[in-house]
């Protein structure tokens, strides 16, 4: 719980590291921060799941966690601008979350809709647990000037009870796309370059082999 509270306080912050280009050492550091950012997202889920039927304070806190969770994603749950291969400005669709129903993958849902629906689940009790450490399965690679991407995977368990009976008991491997962008800001001491980490789509994957 202490970790969740700390993550809530720091939710609006993104990891920054001064750099001109990503070196191997910086890649290792950034990938560790990537795993920590995914852990932060995962830590919010148990505090959101099934809270709509709980006391008022729990519901209000869950809504704050939803907002904090969206801050970790590119576009913060909304469409976001990008430049295509021809140099044209485009709008990319908002990030999505894919879940399963008793082991069958569902159609991906907008993250901005998934989190409130997680809160509104009509079960007596809901548990969302991470069953493994987050693992980088595709290391940072350059996709355009000043932009890198990576993917990471983790196992997640979802359980739901109704009338005291366990009615859903799923365990899925999830893959998270992550973007690392070079940013430049002006300070009184001159320009400063840093790397911003943002999460992308989360999909069901079968690529869990160590």
How would you describe each model-predicted region?
Residues 89-135:
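Short, solvent-exposed helix-to-loop capping segments enriched in aromatics
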């Amino acid at each position: 719980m202490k970790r969740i509270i700390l993550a809530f306080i720091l939710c609006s912050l993104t990891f920054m590291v001064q750099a001109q280009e990503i070196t191997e050492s910086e890649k290792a550091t950034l990938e560790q921060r990537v795993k920590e950012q995914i852990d932060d997202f995962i830590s919010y889920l148990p505090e959101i799941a099934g809270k709509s039927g709980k006391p008022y304070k729990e519901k209000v806190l869950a809504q704050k966690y939803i907002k904090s969770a969206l801050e970790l994603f590119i576009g913060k749950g909304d469409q976001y601008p990008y430049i295509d291969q021809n140099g044209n400005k485009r709008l990319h669709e908002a990030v999505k979350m894919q879940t399963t129903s008793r082991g069958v993958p569902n159609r991906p849902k907008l993250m901005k809709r998934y989190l409130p629906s997680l809160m509104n689940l009509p079960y007596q009790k809901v548990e969302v647990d991470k069953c493994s450490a987050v693992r980088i399965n595709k290391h940072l690679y350059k996709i355009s000037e000043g932009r890198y991407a990576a993917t990471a995977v983790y196992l997640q368990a979802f359980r739901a009870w109704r009338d005291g009976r366990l009615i859903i008991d799923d365990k899925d491997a999830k893959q998270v796309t992550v973007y690392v962008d070079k940013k430049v800001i002006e300070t009184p001491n001159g320009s400063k370059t840093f790397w911003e980490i943002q999460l992308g789509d989360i999909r069901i994957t079968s690529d869990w082999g160590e």
